[in-house]
Amino acid sequence: MNAAERLWRGLARHDWEAVRAQFHPAAVIERAGDGAQLGVEEYLAEHRVAAGRGEEGEIEVLRSVVDGKAAVIEARVGERRCAGIYDLHDGRIAGAIEYWA
């Protein structure tokens, strides 16, 4: 299992320390829809708030594709979908872009 798959497993369990552990400290996560660029702590905070409000619902990974230093995850988050492209370096996520619909 790679860091992107562990990330989504942690998100599904609301295991915020496990989520944090998947990222390099300087990682930046871009949200393609609004152009937001989040640091790891901002990313965690957004997911914590959404989970606390019940906005995330059940999380299910539908597809995972890994090719060397990149991983692509398609996930269902409640009624929403996310496709994320994750750059992997030394077993952790160095950067990512997520597309939400």
Feature annotation, model-predicted:
Residues M1-A26:
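Short acidic-aromatic low-complexity motifs
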Residues A45-A101:
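A beta-strand edge to alpha-helix "cap/lid" segment located at domain peripheries
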Residues E5-L7, R13, G33-Q37, H89-D90:
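Alpha-helical interaction segments
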Residues W16-A18, P25-V65:
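A solvent-exposed, acidic/Ser-Thr-rich amphipathic alpha-helical stretch
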